[in-house]
């Protein structure tokens, strides 16, 4: 029988350099796409108050992402909830849907450093492809609604503050202020009688201002009032505090005349201010979790010890019950048969 496979075995080699070139071309296209999207969405955010608030919502959900990457997420998938690359989702036991593989969310990540002609050091940026949870095979799972204890929330908020915090009588405070930072005294005064949500809303912008002042008694609080206001919004969104009273209609006025790079710098300042406060809070939450875990472990150990102590007592009690009505040395069960015979 004629061998029909011979003609199949004449295959030209595919130069590996072609694969490398294709990868480099794709990476370059993705990087250029990120630059274009970033410029476009930055201009939209700076000129549209509604779009600006949308950006803040995205940044609140992805608080560990840079301001530029939050802008890129807003431009590509503003409703994203959870992002990861192929490897991340594979570790979760799910996969990116076939129809979504060509629709990644592009973000920028720092790569290698290089030396510029003037001797300064620059950083190459590479585009990375991510996918939202909605683009994967993971079935919808209801997210557990964990409500933070209000006292724990406020205790975390005032942990290691950049300025002293002192309560004040309502008549000692400005009528429209629940809290106010005084740079000359490096002190934040907080109106007495407020509930947890009011304290959080009023105290967060003042903590941000105190962080900006960094102990400078001549600091002008008006310089960063907008940044502090936005940082407060980010924190409220993150920790489930009502944000309906926040109004960003004047945001375009703040950004008027700025270049996209300048706008992103201002957004980064807001993001960093919120993260400084959130980082201090996270330490308190972690300490609380560790304390609860230790208490649970101690309770489990105590329960185990009680069970071990009660075990021999139960066995001893059962032994005494069986011995009742039996003469010494008499086999178990004989006394029952003897009493039954006597009755007969």
Residue ranges, per PLM feature:
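N-terminal accessory/interface modules of nucleic-acid-binding and processing proteins
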Residues: 1-323, 328-343
């Amino acid at each position: 029988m004629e061998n029909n496979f011979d003609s199949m075995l004449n295959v030209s080699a595919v130069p590996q350099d072609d694969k490398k070139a294709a990868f480099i071309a794709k990476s370059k296209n993705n990087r250029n796409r990120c630059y274009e999207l970033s410029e476009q969405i930055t201009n939209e955010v700076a000129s549209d108050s509604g779009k600006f608030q949308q950006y803040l919502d995205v940044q609140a959900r992805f608080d560990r992402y840079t301001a530029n990457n939050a802008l890129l997420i807003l431009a590509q998938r503003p409703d994203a909830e959870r992002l990861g690359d192929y490897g991340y989702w594979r570790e979760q036991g799910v996969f990116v849907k076939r129809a979504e593989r060509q629709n990644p969310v592009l973000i920028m990540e720092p790569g290698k450093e290089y030396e510029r002609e003037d001797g300064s050091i620059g950083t190459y940026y590479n585009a990375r492809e991510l996918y939202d949870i909605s683009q994967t095979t993971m079935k919808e799972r209801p997210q557990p609604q964990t409500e933070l204890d209000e006292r724990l929330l406020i205790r975390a908020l005032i942990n290691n503050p950049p300025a002293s915090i002192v309560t004040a009588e309502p008549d000692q405070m400005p009528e429209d202020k629940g809290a106010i930072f005084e740079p000359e005294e490096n002190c934040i005064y907080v109106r007495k009688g407020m509930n947890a949500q009011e304290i959080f809303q009023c105290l967060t912008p003042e903590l941000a201002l105190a962080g900006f002042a960094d102990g400078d008694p001549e600091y002008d609080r008006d310089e960063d009032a907008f940044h502090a206001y936005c940082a407060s919004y980010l924190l409220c969104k993150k920790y489930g505090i009502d944000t309906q009273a926040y109004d960003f209609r004047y945001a375009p006025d703040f950004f008027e005349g700025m270049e996209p790079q300048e706008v992103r710098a201002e957004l980064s300042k807001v993001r960093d201010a919120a993260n400084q406060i959130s980082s201090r809070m996270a330490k308190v939450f972690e300490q609380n979790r560790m304390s609860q875990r230790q208490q649970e472990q101690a309770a489990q150990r105590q329960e185990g010890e009680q069970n071990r102590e009660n075990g021999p007592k139960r066995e001893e009690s059962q032994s005494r019950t069986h011995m009742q009505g039996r003469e010494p040395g008499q086999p178990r069960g004989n006394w029952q048969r003897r009493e039954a015979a006597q009755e007969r």
